[in-house]
Amino acid sequence: MNSMLNFTHKRKSVSRLLAPVALAVILAGCSSSNQQQASASNITAIATDTSANYLIKAESSDGIESIDWNILALKALIKEGQWTQADNQSKRLSRMSLSPIQMAEWQLARATLRYQQGQLQEALNTLNFQPWWPLPDNQYKRYFMLRAELLGQLGQHSKAARQRTMLDQYLPSNQKNANWQNLWQDLSSYNNSQLQSVSLKEDETVLRGWIQLSILKNTYSQRPVRLKSAVDEWLSMNPYHPAHQYLPTELEAIMSMEVAQLDNVALLLPLTGRFESQGKAVRDGFINAMLDDTSRDTDTELTVFDTEAESMTAIMAKLQANGTQFVIGPLRKEKVTAFQQSNTSQINLLALNQPEQLDVSQTQSCYFSLSPEQEAEQAAQHLFAKGHQYPLVLAPKSKFGQRMTDAFNEQWQQLTGRNADIDTFGSRKQIQQQISRIFGLNDSQARISQMNQLTGVKLESQQRSRRDTDAVYLIANKSELTLLKPFIEVAINPEVKPPKLYASSRGNPNANSDNSELRGIEFSDIPLIINPELSFMERFDSLWPNESNTSIRLHAFGMDAYKMVNELPQLRVVDNYTVQGMTGQLGIDNQCVVQREMDWAVFTSDGITPAAE
């Protein structure tokens, strides 16, 4: 088995840390740490008085002092939102003879005004400090900060990043991290080709380093372990780069993964009793994937326990005595709960089922199952993505059917704010009558008969079915589908566009069965069934001949359980990280419940074919 990683909580990437509006307010009058009040000798401080008072002071003074008061009046007008008056005041100042500090403050104020007016390019053009100006750090700080923000919003992210490298020297230590995180966000807008084309001067070593790190991140975005190694190597070769102290949050999460070699893992499954066949199929899939893994550590010890043959207390005692580091299973919900209650040693767990209520204190536990509820939720997402607006869900009148329809409807409500139409069917004998009722044929026939009696004239009216339904999601096995499909087709008014029929994987029980009666129905299933790897399936059929699709799904489930043991820590750390498995595209939610995105196919006269996206 490959090197394993300890679990860590998923870290969210940092969004831009300084909102434009907040920045504009700051730049209208940059505060010092002691909130120094503006005076004629300190035009760089906050304008705390009204513009009217500043203008009065300007009129009553001369020379440099008068200009100072006029600059403070401009800053106050911007702060007050008096943009027309601020424009006029800015023009007045442009005709005055300004010192470098006054010129810099005027540029900053005028750029802030254009920024707040939404004139980003004009604001940027305004900022043009000259290198020979002897200016205080306060002004340089605001100059580079505003230029970086403007360039970023104008889509010139590499130039924005360059401004942030120059800004760093003017920032106090408690503001440096936010600046470097914003620089990282600027570079994250680029792919590797764009990053490699950025023109750099020889002395821009800091910016070059950030670009190199960003290229590594892009290159290994789906290979977190390799990314960790590459960043480690880069840091060792660049010991003085600020990334050592201010590593971007997403890279920090990667670096927090601790590689730990697992020597001892256990598989807990029902290998006797009622669930024997399911347990053995999962076991065979797990071991199959393990043997196929050429990069695994051959010294890893795997122990398989039969959860039906001994108590969980006895199994737990053996796990602790053996020094087991990771458990896969159990398969039954009640056994999962029993394991967690006995797990005083905090052994990492990938449960192969999900209890009704997740225990949030079980931070070392993740959950993976072939959840029919997840399949129903995905069906709602799939129908919504296909543009359907009024789906009807038909399910068996049972607890299982209720769970499936509830899952579909909850997802549909989240997507549309509306409930889906839901109905049930019973025994095979009742299906035709129930379909007629569901699609309104019985009511329609009754209305026609009533009109005939009232008028005494035979009406040539056709029975009308519901017109709004544009899709039907059928939660049914194959025999039920075989009955439902023709009855629905008969019930639909021929003048109305028939609803598209969809089904769950329950309707696809056997790879070799005749599905011609189901042609046209689109259904969800695992990739191994919809897009099988021929070489793998040939080997599978030779080892386990004539297996049903149910057994194939369980075998694939076992294979993916093995894959997830290696991938879980990366899934927990890297946002939007997914893995292609035999049962679907695999990711996790914030409770470490594995989410499966299944494939879709269509029944045809010749079998099944992948559905068009």
Swiss-Prot record:
Keywords for this protein: Cell outer membrane, Cell shape, Lipoprotein, Membrane, Palmitate, Peptidoglycan synthesis, Signal
GO biological process: peptidoglycan biosynthetic process; regulation of cell shape
Lipidation (N-palmitoyl cysteine): 30
CDD domains associated with the record: PBP1_YraM_LppC_lipoprotein-like (cd06339)
An example Gene Ontology molecular-function term: enzyme regulator activity
Localization terms from the record: Cell outer membrane
Keyword Manganese: no
Membrane topology, from the record: Lipid-anchor
Pfam families: LppC
NAD in keyword set: no
Lipidation (S-diacylglycerol cysteine): 30
Leader peptide range in chain numbering: 1-29
Gene Ontology CC, one term: periplasmic side of cell outer membrane
SUPFAM superfamilies to which the protein is assigned, alphabetical: Periplasmic binding protein-like I
Assembly with partners or alone: Interacts with PBP1a.
Cited function: Regulator of peptidoglycan synthesis that is essential for the function of penicillin-binding protein 1A (PBP1a).
Similarity field: Belongs to the LpoA family.
Protein name in UniProt: Penicillin-binding protein activator LpoA
Organism ancestry: Bacteria, Pseudomonadati, Pseudomonadota, Gammaproteobacteria, Vibrionales
